Amino acid sequence: MKDIIYIKDLRVKTIIGIFDWERKVKQEVSIDMEFPFDCKRAAKTDSIEDTVDYKTICKGVIKFVEESSFQLQESLAEGIASLVKDTYGVESIKLRVSKP
């Protein structure tokens, strides 16, 4: 059985939107992520090497989002999902990107 890791309300500024006025200044987006992970080994060893390093994932997502420029939130979400799966070995991810 897998546990669920949650990262909620990660706020990052980026260029996003289809209208000219949206693309003139960075807007804040809020990102929620959840992904399955078996935490048994990490719980036994109490070692960061045996778990998902949330800080590293958050730093990577922040860097990606800050450096990106998308018209659609869907494109940004797909980019984040690909980054997290490909770079950090997460097998699947549930993601929400919103402009508060």
Map each language-model feature to its residues:
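N-terminal, polar/charged subdomain of small-to-medium soluble alpha/beta proteins
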Residues: 1-100
